[in-house]
Swiss-Prot record:
Domain of life: Eukaryota
Organism: Trypanosoma cruzi (strain CL Brener)
Record protein name field: Very long chain fatty acid elongase 4
Transmembrane regions listed in the UniProt entry: 33-53, 64-84, 115-135, 150-170, 172-192, 199-219, 241-261
One GO BP annotation of this record: sphingolipid biosynthetic process
Functional note: Involved in the synthesis of fatty acids. Elongates C16:0 and C18:0 fatty acids to C26:0, with C24:0 being the main product.
Name of the gene encoding the protein in the UniProt record: ELO4B
Residues of the active site: 148
Lineage: Eukaryota, Discoba, Euglenozoa, Kinetoplastea, Metakinetoplastina
UniProt topology in membrane: Multi-pass membrane protein
Catalytic function, reaction form: a very-long-chain acyl-CoA + malonyl-CoA + H(+) = a very-long-chain 3-oxoacyl-CoA + CO2 + CoA
Record family assignment: Belongs to the ELO family.
Length: 287
């Protein structure tokens, strides 16, 4: 019992003892790791289905899928709790402009908030395993799915290297959405799709609203960087990348939402049909 209590106490202390120098070293000295992961991911999406899985039976990965989703759900919930708590305090103390445009190293470089933002960035690489489940179960991998995983990993790594203050908002929003999204996938994987299915449109709407909020935040930083008198510490490369990323996400999620929930069709066609059927049957990833 003492071991369990000591372990829990240790886990509580780890985020508070986090030092930003460690994150700086990772992002400065390990950029090539991101490149390797992205190359392997592209091979997974485009080569494995055609050259490895083409003549094979799909793997039964239901049990690993259950544990994978509950693990990501708990991770996202803990991250959401910490980031929301710290974001509210930061906003209350500094206001929206200073929170979004100026990096507060005393809050976002060391300690609990920095810990969860750092591991949020790193988590975008293992989250690519979502696609592994699709590929090896011979489920369709639509453009939105792999494009989202690939580009968000690249942008987050760049944002971690550049220490953009607006990234605190992005991490907080993403943790919140993912905590609900992965719980939904967990329930579906456990065979409770009929029970949980009614909230599927709500989750897609949350994702869409996240893209709207992200786009507005990037536009806000762009205004203060290019036109505002006081400026903005978000570098302009991050602003341009953010506009392209969030703008494209908004468009793609809006199209997906329209196809899945607004168009009343008996039998949708194309990749949207395959994706919708896959998601209905197996609770697979929306993005």
């Amino acid at each position: 019992m003492d071991f369990v209590l000591n372990t829990i106490q240790w886990l509580r202390e780890v985020p508070h003892n986090f030092k930003g120098e460690f994150a700086t070293v990772v992002f400065d000295d390990s950029a090539d790791i991101l490149v390797y992961c992205c190359v392997l991911y592209i091979l997974l999406v485009f080569m494995v289905p055609e050259h490895i899985m083409k003549n094979r039976e799909p793997f039964n990965l239901r049990l690993p899928f259950v544990f994978w989703n509950i693990g990501l759900c708990l991770f996202s919930f803990c991250g959401a709790y910490s980031c929301v708590k710290n974001m509210i305090a930061l906003y209350w103390e500094r206001g929206f402009y200073r929170t979004t445009c100026f990096f507060d190293s005393s809050v976002a470089y060391d300690g609990e908030f920095a810990f969860w933002v750092f591991y949020f960035i790193l988590s975008k690489i293992p989250e690519m395993i979502d696609t592994v489940f699709l590929v090896f179960q011979k489920k369709p991998v639509i453009f939105l799915h792999w494009y989202h995983h690939l580009t968000v990993a690249i942008f987050c790594w760049h944002a971690g290297h550049a220490l953009i203050p607006s990234g605190l908002w992005f991490a907080t929003m993403n943790y919140c959405v993912h905590s609900i999204m992965y719980f939904y996938y967990f329930m579906c994987a456990c065979g409770m799709r009929k029970f949980i299915r009614p909230i599927a449109p709500f989750i897609t709407m949350m994702q869409l609203l996240q893209m709207v909020a992200g786009t507005l935040i990037v536009l806000y930083t762009a205004y203060h960087s290019y036109l505002g008198e006081s400026g903005c510490e978000v570098d302009r490369t991050s602003i341009r990348l953010g506009l392209v990323m969030y703008g494209s996400y908004f468009f793609l999620f809006a199209v997906l939402f329209g196809k899945l929930y607004l168009k009343k069709q008996v039998k949708p066609s194309g990749t949207a049909s395959a994706y919708a059927m896959s998601k209905k049957r197996n609770g697979e990833k929306m993005a």
